From Swiss-Prot:
UniProt function note: Required for the formation of a threonylcarbamoyl group on adenosine at position 37 (t(6)A37) in tRNAs that read codons beginning with adenine. Is involved in the transfer of the threonylcarbamoyl moiety of threonylcarbamoyl-AMP (TC-AMP) to the N6 group of A37, together with TsaE and TsaB. TsaD likely plays a direct catalytic role in this reaction.
Binding site for substrate: 134-138, 167, 180, 272
UniProt-recorded name of the protein: tRNA N6-adenosine threonylcarbamoyltransferase
Reaction(s) the record says it catalyses: L-threonylcarbamoyladenylate + adenosine(37) in tRNA = N(6)-L-threonylcarbamoyladenosine(37) in tRNA + AMP + H(+)
Acyltransferase is among the record's keywords: yes
GO cellular component, one term: cytoplasm
Length: 337
């Protein structure tokens, strides 16, 4: 089976062609970072319009790079949600239209299931069951994964997601958009133990996250301290360490609760090197293993949508003809495969 994957949930237009025997045949991505930089964040209307401009050229590019035509495509998978409703509708409309015109089946994919399954694109893949930490700009959640579609959300953010906290704190520090990677780069220049930030919700039972208070703590620290480069780097490091420690503490707690010894990290924040190092060290100490996608598949992309969609298509979980985007869509509401 050969699937065309379409991702348009936020500010990246991602197109990919995935073959169940040959693997990933092509992967085309356009990022809107420059478009939104002047606004310090994603502007939904601008994001939707840019998806409209870029999606067809990227589909042509992906098909060309995969050395195939529409006749070689067996099915189409597109991101149905969650995400920005206008952006979702662009991908859904194009995906459904191509499916109708080409006479192919189509399926709407859950964006976070795409992230969760992104490590399956690598050569070394995790076996079920495993614990998944999904951390991005819009979501932070801990999921027990027994199989595809067999998900139990153990904890999630009650306010700001981890990636959102990174971006907002970076903005408070005067860093350009996208703030998360820039804050991490600044933190690498910081000295340890200069500031002690709280580790939110780690002093109580449960696996939920809260990062809004940490962001406020960072804002107060920034306001009270000198505005020189080294001080800013030290604050950035303290903030990053607090987020990473919080995530690691929650992961360790969840692993003990589930009895699993395999951990998957996915989503945009999974590209953070300090987080990867911390969780790898933790899992080594626990006698387990950690898995994550390569850097280009940490952020939104069409490859993960093509792969996740293929699993649904093989189970004959097809979509009706109606075009629908779902800005809110609980991960654990998905049917098993």
């Amino acid at each position: 089976m050969r699937v065309l994957g379409i991702e348009t949930s936020c500010d990246e237009t991602g197109i990919a062609v995935y073959d169940d025997e040959k693997g990933l045949l092509s992967h085309a991505l356009y990022s809107q970072v420059k478009l939104h930089a002047d606004y310090g964040g994603v502007v939904p209307e601008l994001a939707s319009r840019d998806h409209v401009r870029k999606i067809i050229p990227l589909i042509r590019q992906a098909l060309k790079e995969a050395n195939c035509t529409q006749d070689d495509i067996d099915a189409i998978a597109y991101t149905k949600g969650p995400g920005l409703v206008g952006a979702l509708l662009v991908g859904a409309c194009v995906g459904r239209s191509l499916a109708f015109a080409w006479g192919k089946p189509a399926v709407g994919v859950h964006h976070m299931e795409g992230h969760l399954l992104a490590p399956m694109l690598e050569e070394d893949v995790p076996e079920f069951p495993f614990l998944a930490l999904l951390v991005s700009g819009g979501h932070s959640m801990m999921v027990a994964v027994e199989g595809i579609g067999r998900y139990q959300v153990l904890g999630e953010s009650v306010d700001d997601a981890a990636g959102e906290a990174f971006d907002k704190t970076a903005k408070l520090m005067g860093l350009d958009y996208p703030g998360g990677p820039r804050l991490a780069k600044l933190a690498a220049q910081g000295e340890p133990n200069c500031y002690r930030f709280p580790r939110p919700m780690t002093d109580r039972p449960g696996l939920d996250f809260s990062f809004s208070g940490l962001k406020t703590f960072a804002a107060n620290t920034i306001a009270d301290e000198p505005d020189d480069e080294q001080t800013r780097a030290n604050i950035a490091r303290a903030f990053e360490e607090a987020v990473v420690d919080t995530l690691a503490i929650k992961c360790k707690r969840a692993l003990k609760q589930t009895g699993y010894n395999r951990l998957v990290i996915a989503g945009g924040v999974s590209a953070n090197s300090r987080l990867r190092e911390s969780l790898a060290e933790m899992m080594q100490g626990l006698g387990g293993r950690v898995y994550y996608p390569r850097g280009e598949f940490c952020t939104d992309n069409g490859a993960m949508i093509a792969y996740a969609g293929m699993q649904r298509l093989k189970a004959d979980q097809l979509e009706p003809l109606a075009v629908k985007g779902m800005p809110r869509w609980p991960l654990d509401s998905l049917p098993p495969v």
